């Protein structure tokens, strides 16, 4: 049973790491924005801070880079706006949990 947990933890970690290293599909205007803001990208955005204007500028966490997660907010006037924040995706949280559990058992 322990071997199965270790193998599953390794697979989840590898899959999560490979998906976090891949570049998300960039639109042309986002790519131009990234090139124009090269200096501001060097200062990363901490977890739970707004990343609406710089969607690829989130800092790294313990194991993975935080992802800019966006939601659509509807105001009382009925106007929709997009708000984004740096956070840990659920599959990264699961991988960190498994690794932390493995460290407690083996280490």
Curated annotation (Swiss-Prot):
A GO-annotated cellular component: extracellular region
Keyword Cell division assigned to the entry: answer is: no
Q: What is its main location?
A: secreted
Q: Which Pfam families match?
A: Toxin_35
Alphabetical list of PROSITE patterns matching this protein = SPIDER_CSTX
Here the disulfide bonds are: 44-59, 51-68, 58-86, 70-84
Keyword line? Disulfide bond, Knottin, Secreted, Signal, Toxin
Q: Kindly indicate where the leader peptide sits in this chain.
A: 1-20
- Any idea where this protein resides? Secreted
Q: Which family does it belong to?
A: Belongs to the neurotoxin 19 (CSTX) family. 04 (U1-Lctx) subfamily.
- Protein name per its UniProtKB record: U1-lycotoxin-Ls1b
């Amino acid at each position: 049973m322990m071997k199965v947990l270790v193998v599953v933890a390794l697979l989840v970690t590898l899959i999560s790491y490979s998906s976090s290293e891949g570049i998300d599909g960039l639109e042309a205007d986002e790519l131009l924005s990234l090139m124009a803001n090269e200096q501001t990208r060097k200062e990363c955005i901490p977890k739970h801070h707004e990343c609406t204007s710089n969607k690829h500028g989130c800092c790294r966490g313990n194991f993975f880079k935080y992802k800019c997660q966006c939601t659509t907010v509807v105001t009382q006037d009925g106007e929709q706006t997009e708000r984004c924040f740096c956070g840990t995706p659920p599959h990264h949280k699961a991988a960190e949990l498994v690794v932390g559990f493995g460290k407690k058992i083996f280490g």
